Amino acid sequence: MAAPRTLLLCPPSLSAHPEALNKIYEIHDRSTADLQMLDRIAAGLVQLPAATYDVVLLLTDADGTTRESHKLLARDVASKVAGALKVGGILKAKTEAILAGLSESPNGMVKTEQVESVSIPLKFGKKKTNGVNGTNGAVNPDGSVPLNLNGKRNQPEPVKPVGVGFVDFSDDLDDPIITGEDDDDDLIDEDDLITEEDMARPVIQQCRPKAGKRRRACKDCTCGLKEKMEAEDAAKRTTADKALNTMKLGADDLDELDFTVQGKVGSCGNCALGDAFRCDGCPYIGLPAFKPGEEVRLLNNDIQL
């Protein structure tokens, strides 16, 4: 009997630790064990042979955890590993193994034999009558059992309330046996309900504006997007006109302001701050600083405050 073959799935971090790999080969004989890197299998650089290995062992990372191994053991890699297992083979790792078609066992994840599914038709027959030989459990006063030879029921019909209708669910109404194989004679083909006129009718596509761009209405827009955009443009235009009207200046607004009036300042706003803040053409150059609103008179080049 051939020795069981083992596939060792190694994370890339172990390749930088040869001492760890040597310990692994001390436990597993190289003649019966194959070592493959998980990243090479995930990249498609290594093709695993089909139905070859009895045991697949997922090795831990260099730090003793399985984070890197579980990250690389994705569903497609797990499917490749499951294909390399023999029937009854064991994969000692749970990540994505069940989704790859493996079953859990006390020793690990086992590859079970695939059995083709068989469809079984269900047949529904008539409801069986109670009792034996169609007697419905009825017994005569003398202890004898009446036999129903004509196959019909002898029970009297229940009295129906006046003005009230009900359905007797115990009556099978002598319907034929349902075999589950429906007759297609009563089915209507949906394509027969569509006429040539329906096929030629154009289908109006829904307006679906692209993200990041301004919506544009179709030329023959019927969904109301065109009217909505026109209303938005009109509202923006009205807002802009109102803002423009507030910025217009009249003739009175352009006149020079008299600094002698309380609360008013000159056009430059610095007439009352002294020469250091006055313009070149200011008529008050050389005059001392004065308070806004203070009356200033010039008489024979003398300052009269």
Swiss-Prot record:
Leader sequence segment: none
Residues bound to [2Fe-2S] cluster: C207, C218, C221, C223
Motif (Cx2C motif 1): 268-271
GO BP: any one term: iron-sulfur cluster assembly
Region (Fe-S binding site B): 268-282
Main location: cytoplasm
Domain observations: The C-terminal domain binds 2 Fe-S clusters but is otherwise mostly in an intrinsically disordered conformation. The N-terminal domain has structural similarity with S-adenosyl-L-methionine-dependent methyltransferases, but does not bind S-adenosyl-L-methionine. It is required for correct assembly of the 2 Fe-S clusters.
Protein name: Fe-S cluster assembly protein DRE2
